[in-house]
Each structure stands twice: as C-alpha cells, then as structure tokens.
C-alpha cells in the first residue's frame, strides 16, 4: 500500500483469490507479472471452467504463469528480489507479493479464558446468528469460522446486534451468499458448485452458455466468459451458478434472488431482461434447461 510507482516486474507467490486478483490488477497497470502457482491451475479452489478462462486470459495478456511450481524462498537482491523454486529454478523481479493465505488474529487475547471455542485454525466458532459458544459473546468477520467476505461480515454484525437486543432475526444461510473474484474478467459464484454436483454431494443438472453467443457481448467485443447454471434434478429449482464476465459481480444478483426464493429455471426464464444485455444470457441459460413435459 506504500508503493509510489507500479512495480517493473511483480512476482506473485500463490494463485488463490488474492494472488490472482493482484496479478490481474498489476498486469492491467502495465507491470510485468510472474505468477507462481503450486497447483496445476490457478484458482484451485474455484470453478474449474472459470479458472481455465482466467488462466488463458492471463497468459494471453502477457503474464507468465508457472504452474506446479512451489516457491521455497524469496530474498532481496541488489536490484529487487529473487524467488527460488523447489526445483532449483529462480525468478528475478523488482517486487514480490506473498499471497499464501492468512490466519486470524485471535491468539492471546483471552478468548479461551472467556470460554469462547476456537477451531484448530484459530477461528472463532459461531452459529448462524453470529453467536459464539458463550451466549453473550458474538463474533463477526474474518475472525469467525464463516465465509471471509465483507458482505458476510456486515450481515453477521447486523444479525448479532439485532439478536442481542432481542429482535427477530433470520439466521444467515451461507449457501445463498454470492462471492466474486475481481480479476479481468470477474468470476461470480453463488450456491452449490459443479464439484459438489459431480462428486454426488447434491443432485443437479448443469448448463453452460458461452458469453460469446450473447448479442451485447458481441457489440462490446467480449469473447471470454460464460454463464453456468445448476438446477435440482428433481424440481428444476435453481441451486447455484457461476458467471465469468466483465462486472460479473453485478450480474450475479438475479441468481442470488432465484436461489433465495427457490425459483425454478422455468420461472427464471420467464423474466424479461433488457435486450441486448449481458444479463440476457442468464435467462437464455435457464430457458435451455427446460424439461419438456
């Protein structure tokens, strides 16, 4: 945060959400970027199709992506930094960003003495109204064991206050929480994932519609991205979705509402989006999931 100029060559260690976002941002600002990933693909915890699109865009835009490469050390040099990989290779750059995860700042502040239960990772255990194991103590935000998102933290804070004051509250349902990765293009997700459907955690049908088929996308030159919907095999209810697109964070809201109100794909398809618009791909995908009968 104290940089006075953009790095000439930024080495990013870690290809999770933070690493991918900063790598994308600095490449867009004109920095040479090398992304060191220990996994086979960037964003290993995200939708595989979405991660594939982002990695392809990264490489096409001139970013160097070193997959299956584990960084052993990063040291300062006379001209910048040198990252040494597990196989002995070295990468030289002007700056390095370490994006290899975070830990909650909950140690030695008296939580255990107060009877507040922690997870093995040090996060505070909370229920769906943000209350800890001690009835009069609440926790909100990244220190809790809920989703580490600003929207969730804000909702936890509101829920905790209302609940503590005796007001009626709706318990937080993390399955309905949308999240977004601010790369270019963005990745927005909500609900169940394709991995959970594929491994049998929940039954569902999957449909993916490339954004390149969208009229508005053609008008503005967007070729990368897609809309992917997940629906219950039994009822046709929308249970999840992934959008990879410019401003996907703005496009995901219809799917959030569909999941929150348990709309079917047919009900979603009956909505009238503006034509032409990127949001039209959502109803197009829903329409394609209709089962005749």
Question: How would you describe each model-predicted region?
Answer:
Residues 1-7, 90-166:
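FAD-site-proximal beta/loop scaffold in flavoenzymes
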Residues 1-2, 7-11, 17-78, 82, ...:
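Rossmann-like dinucleotide-binding cores of NAD(P)H-dependent redox enzymes
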Residues 20-21, 26, 43, 105-108, ...:
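Glycine/Thr-rich phosphate-binding loops of Rossmann-like dinucleotide-binding domains
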Residues 36, 84, 118, 126, ...:
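Hydrophobic alpha-helical segments, especially N-terminal targeting/anchoring helices
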Residues 48, 77, 96, 138, ...:
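Residue-level structural signal for beta-strand termini and adjacent loop
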Residues 78, 120, 233-235:
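Short acidic-glycine loop/turn motifs at beta-strand connectors
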Residues 165-166, 177, 182-293:
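Flexible, glycine-rich terminal cap/loop adjacent to redox cofactors
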